[in-house]
UniProtKB/Swiss-Prot annotation:
Alphabetized UniProt keyword annotations: Isomerase, Pyridoxal phosphate
Entry's Gene Ontology cellular component terms: cytosol
Provenance organism: Verminephrobacter eiseniae (strain EF01-2)
Classification lineage: Bacteria, Pseudomonadati, Pseudomonadota, Betaproteobacteria, Burkholderiales
Name of the protein: Alanine racemase
Catalytic site: 35, 256
Amino acid sequence: MPRPIQARIHSSALQANLRRVRQSVPDAKVWAVVKANAYGHGIARVFESLRGADGFALLDLAEAQGLRGLGWRGPILLLEGVFEPRDLELCSRLGLWHVVHCDEQIDMLAAHRSQAPQHVFLKLNAGMNRLGFAPQRYRSAWARLGALAQVDEISLMAHFSDADGPRGIAPQLAAFVRATQDLPGARSLCNSAATLRHAADASVRADWVRAGIVLYGSAPDFPGHDAGHWGLQPAMTLATRLIGVQQLQAGDTVGYGARFVAPGPMAIGVAACGYADGYPLHCGTGTPVLVDGIRTRVVGRVSMDMLTVDLTPLQRAGLQPGFGSEVTLWGRASSGAVLSIDEVAQAGGTLGYELMCALAQRVPVTLDGRA
């Protein structure tokens, strides 16, 4: 028998989250962002649930090829653009759209020979200072692209750095409006946080929104708001079972480094999940977990293959957890109880994004219970 740990992907949650995005931006087109293999969920697994989007956005040419192989004939956007000249030939062959964020990419386009002109998204560095042309250079980059026979359409985009926080988007939105004033072309500004928090403003919604983490049921502005506030459903459940129970006395310690000391008689459960499965090492005592649908906590240090949980809340509820009891590390328990991946990530000093993407290869993944 394999270890009892398993990640389950829920197609109904993916579909519901996409509908939630459309409710926020009924007049905009939606990019379903599936970079990092759909945030660890698997592009092939999420494809049918998200094919109601208007396009897919990702980074990797191999993943783009995979989407075409699945039968997708709509738009695919390469969010970091091309990395070398030969990538443009594949863009032509597969009909890919791609971001242009630097002079080197324009140079590659200028030297490219193809019968199929390219659709590009010209990126503005509105203040995040990762990728994109500075505002004072944006219009000249647009003019260079517009003069190329290799380019048939130029869309305009930027990425907000603080759509999820109190600084907001106003300065970067203003920079985008100034840089793109009177330029033709579709606009794309909103990431997940901006889509939920700022899309009431038509200038923010623009023509395309880029829905990423929101599709997978994580709140982009946690802890300011949780997933429930936004009406999102967890698309991934990581679950395992208890493989042992220990009875402790006052003063007994748990795990490596004796990080937890029992305050009195208590029972702990040993769950088959550890940091080698992608569960964060730094999720120590107090990290929330569900056992048979009841909320409790991790105690002690997470090991490579195991972690330990406090069974006191279950016993207080009149339950007798034991070998084989269900343990929900994040997501939805069989009882329907939900533990947000964002809460677990916060306890480990990280983000839900990282936990999704860090799921270990050794963890079996099913879609709606099917391998």
